């Protein structure tokens, strides 16, 4: 069963992976998506892509350093999501903003939670 998308769309402790740097980056993606949802313009779309790509690179670095077994499949999910974000054009349709919010929630709570205590 999918996890609910919070409304308002803000990070809370239910999303903690317990690695400070990664939690802060997740919080930043939430903030960027919230901004895009409230002011749907090219600048906020670029911000969302930038903070997401930066976070994915950092998270993947943690995984590689720890020889995390799920690294390759996790990286593919990141690449697919970044490709989807690159396909967006501002103003982004509401359904696509919701898709990104839902993807982030499900990804953190099902995929990222698998690396807790392993990095």
Curated annotation (Swiss-Prot):
Q: Which PROSITE patterns match?
A: HEMERYTHRINS
- Does Metal-binding count among this protein's keywords? yes
Question: Record's InterPro entries?
Answer: Haemerythrin, Haemerythrin_Fe_BS, Hemerythrin, Hemerythrin-like, Hemerythrin-like_sf, Hemerythrin_metal-bd
Gene3D superfamilies under this entry?
A: Hemerythrin-like
Q: Which positions carry the signal peptide feature in this UniProt record?
A: none
Chain sites annotated for binding Fe cation 1: 26, 55, 59, 112
Could you state a single Gene Ontology molecular function term? oxygen carrier activity
CDD domains in alphabetical order: Hemerythrin (cd12107)
Can you tell me which residues bind Fe cation 2?
A: 59, 74, 78, 107, 112
Entry keyword set? Iron, Metal-binding, Oxygen transport, Transport
Q: Which family does it belong to?
A: Belongs to the hemerythrin family.
Q: What does this protein do?
A: Hemerythrin is a respiratory protein in blood cells of certain marine worms. The oxygen-binding site in each chain contains two iron atoms.
This chain's protein is named Hemerythrin subunit A
């Amino acid at each position: 069963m999918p996890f609910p998308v919070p409304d308002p769309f803000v990070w809370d402790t239910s999303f903690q992976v317990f690695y400070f740097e990664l939690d802060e980056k997740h919080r930043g993606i939430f903030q960027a998506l919230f901004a895009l949802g409230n002011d749907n313009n090219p600048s906020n779309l670029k911000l969302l892509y930038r903070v997401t790509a930066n976070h994915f690179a950092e998270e993947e670095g943690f995984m590689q350093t720890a020889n995390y077994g799920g690294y390759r499949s996790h990286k593919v999910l990141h690449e697919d999501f970044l490709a989807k974000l690159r396909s967006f054009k501002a103003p982004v349709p509401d359904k696509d903003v919701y898709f990104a919010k839902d993807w982030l929630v499900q990804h953190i709570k099902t995929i990222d939670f698998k690396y807790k205590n392993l990095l």
